[in-house]
């Protein structure tokens, strides 16, 4: 599962790493959805134009804009920092960023989606998630689904970019069956499900 698929660049990487897997992708920003559908052309992926949240229905999504320049000069409006959470002090880290007006998006929960979509006794090797501070919200509404997941790779930026964003401890608390395996550059954390994955050998 790729939650927060954005333009599909990481989708293609996941497809290369797991050549026999089907990648289920979630994205709610219309600009990113358009990019994804241009970049990703494969029957091994499915894109769901919805935001995973703690309820099913409709919610405000806070899009990002602006242009960072440099290697992103030709990208256009920056759509990689939008969130269900309101912006806080993101401009402290990215002064060029613009906070765009909120838009309405459709939402569902991880558990509701899985119950409708995945077969019984499924196994999910990996959840890759980057939803700009709202990761714990997704996990708290996916308790049953997480029982079938081996690993979670999640972003957890400690900088106050969004109001109500999860801290590292709060993210860990939302994954009670998981333990932290490794922290990677870019504020990325890898967790493993200790009920499904054997302990590492030392």
What positions do the PLM features span?
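Phosphate/nucleotide-binding beta-alpha loop and adjacent structural elements of enzyme active sites
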Residues: 1-202
């Amino acid at each position: 599962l790729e939650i927060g698929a954005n333009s599909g660049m990481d989708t293609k990487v996941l497809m290369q790493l797991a050549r026999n897997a089907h990648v289920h992708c979630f994205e709610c920003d219309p600009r990113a959805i358009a990019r994804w559908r241009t970049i990703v052309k494969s029957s091994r992926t499915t894109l769901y134009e919805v935001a995973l949240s703690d309820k099913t229905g409709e919610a405000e999504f806070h899009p990002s804009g602006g242009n960072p320049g440099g290697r992103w000069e030709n990208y256009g409006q920056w759509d990689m920092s939008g969130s269900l959470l309101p912006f806080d002090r993101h401009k402290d880290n990215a002064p060029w960023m613009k906070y765009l007006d909120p838009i309405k998006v459709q939402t569902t929960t991880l558990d509701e989606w899985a119950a409708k979509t995945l077969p019984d006794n499924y196994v999910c090797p990996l959840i890759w998630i980057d939803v700009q501070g709202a990761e714990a919200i997704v996990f708290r509404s996916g308790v049953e689904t997480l029982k079938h997941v081996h690993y979670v790779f999640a972003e957890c930026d400690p900088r106050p970019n969004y109001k109500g964003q999860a801290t590292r401890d709060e993210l860990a608390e939302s994954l009670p069956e998981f333990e932290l395996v490794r922290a990677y550059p870019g504020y990325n954390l890898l967790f493993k499900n200790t009920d499904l994955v054997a302990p590492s050998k030392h």
